């Protein structure tokens, strides 16, 4: 399957878009929760506005900022109070998925909006939308992955909208899983591609098998077919690997995860996640590493959920403040998923040291996100869930992030890495 964007043309070029087994008792309900949370749909429409020009021009020499020469470890730090509040008004941003618009859905507490991440050994500046737009001028930025990729994308669109209005020029697929916005002011395209495994996959459905099918040695061409027209890419996967699945490699069944009734070897999902990331990064290196315009790539690390008990229990994620430093340790599945992603990024960087136009970084947000149990929609994934009184059972989203919310910090770090890369490029000129 090729790109869903294949019929939308561009002026310059076409966009052809076990470890050991984990305990079943601990994760038995997580796939069901995630499946329910990922599918509360948008209305479906096709927008026929043409995609406008984008090229891979270098950043203007008049970029209005001074980048830091030294790198910063953003992974260690603490959340501190910030009287300035959020970077944008959720009610005024039109790109937020309804389930993450917590204030509009009646969330009564506002304290979660007044925190900022403070790294231990360096500074994280407040997001500056004009700087981001200037750095991405004439480029195509793509977010590829599951609904956490979409969550991060929608955060970024809101953060940029105060400086330049994004124009939705394309949408397609169930739940509008493939969309593109155009920023006319800076000739920027920003897209989102639904690809919950990054590799080729067949998702479970009500009419087909009750498990996913992953082909670990084939990248998902729904996004990879567009690779030549992408200048910067943010990859984000993890949660969909918890679902029941059968895995294929070399067209042979490799094993499965939670597949009772099928005559396949249970291998869990840790090694499978590693293979999927390895295949994806190899495809980027092979197709773009020596390409004339190259690519800048990020892997956003695993985002922890914060369920306390059953997903449909009142108070499933009841916290209203961040954890304090030392209150919560990164461990278990959250730590293992992050470690795999970071290790594969480092391995790919080692394999691409001779490629001048391929840059890769882990956007390591797992620890700082773990400290924000207060940042999820919870019951406010639906509008005014207690309008008719409080009930013992209510659906909760303790996976995705409210907008505005902690996920905005991910994009602040994203900008700082882009600034660092630009600084390094200028030194090499």
Swiss-Prot record:
It is an enzyme of class 2 (transferase). The chain crosses the membrane at residues 21-41. It comes from the Eukaryota. It is a single-pass type II membrane protein. Glycans are attached at residues 46, 89, 189, 263, 351. Residues 1-20 are cytoplasmic. It is found in: Golgi apparatus membrane. Its EC number is 2.3.1.-. The keyword Transferase applies. Its main location: Golgi. The active site is at 147 (nucleophile), 397 (proton donor), 400 (proton acceptor). A motif (GDS motif) lies at residues 145-147. Belongs to the PC-esterase family. TBL subfamily. This is Xyloglucan O-acetyltransferase 1. It comes from Populus trichocarpa (Western balsam poplar).
